[in-house]
Amino acid sequence: MNNALLDARLQQALGYTFSRSGLLQQALTHRSYGALNNERLEFLGDSVLNCSVARALYDAFPDLPEGSLSRLRANLVRQETLAEIAGALRLGDSLRLGEGELKSGGFRRPSILADALESLFGAVFLDAGFDEAQRVVRRLFDPLVAQIDPKASGKDPKTRLQEILQSRRLPLPEYRLVGTEGEAHDQSFIVECLLAKPVLSTRGTGKSRRAAEQEAARQACAELQR
């Protein structure tokens, strides 16, 4: 697939079409590829991301104190989460990487994927302003925010499940990707959460693998707390 088609697919998955295609190209260009790379856009996008996620949490959990909100935000914007969202968008297929990074599999490296996603947020901000950039961020992160149970000290379902099992001295869960649904630009991931003791299997569906894992963990928590 040529670059134009890959870029079109990425924009469709992102839910935003760039007016200035040069910004998209820059956001997708790693420093190993050329001088006009995405590092400055990443700097902008990091701020857009943090502000947008902070607002999402502020609106969703009016009773949570600042400390809990900060912990939740840190969990949502960490590299692992960003890389999984980037993977769901198939962002790696569109990256411009130098020959060395290509050979070493840089298009799969979590740090490169996470940085590129932040660069995209920065590029949308420059292309259309903060409101549109925030909309793009919220479209990707609101499903993760919706899975958080505020009654569980603001902890996400995977963390809660791990703590429940550890408190009972039971083995930790295993998460397996069962499959995907939908078109390439709008895929949903299906993940199974397996507990060895007590024997339990739950399934979750989400727009990213992480979101699906969280949903499967949420169901497992509910079963264990019955």
UniProtKB/Swiss-Prot annotation:
Reactions catalysed: Endonucleolytic cleavage to 5'-phosphomonoester
Catalytic residue positions: D46, E118
Cell compartment(s), UniProt: Cytoplasm
UniProt record, GO biological process: mRNA processing; regulation of gene expression; rRNA processing; tRNA processing
Functional summary from the UniProt entry: Digests double-stranded RNA. Involved in the processing of primary rRNA transcript to yield the immediate precursors to the large and small rRNAs (23S and 16S). Processes some mRNAs, and tRNAs when they are encoded in the rRNA operon. Processes pre-crRNA and tracrRNA of type II CRISPR loci if present in the organism.
UniProt key word Transcription: no
A Pfam entry, by short name: dsrm
A molecular function (GO) term: rRNA binding
Binding site for Mg(2+): E42, D115, E118
Family matches, as Gene3D superfamilies: 3.30.160.20, Ribonuclease III domain (1.10.1520.10)
Enzyme Commission numbers on file: 3.1.26.3
Domain DRBM: 156-226
Cofactor(s), names only, from the UniProt record: Mg(2+)
Tree of life domain: Bacteria
Class of the enzyme per the UniProt entry, highest EC level: hydrolase
Subunit note: Homodimer.
GO cellular component: cytoplasm
Name the record gives this protein: Ribonuclease 3
Domain RNase III: start-end pairs: 7-129
Keywords: Cytoplasm, Endonuclease, Hydrolase, Magnesium, Metal-binding, mRNA processing, Nuclease, RNA-binding, rRNA processing, rRNA-binding, tRNA processing
UniProt similarity note: Belongs to the ribonuclease III family.
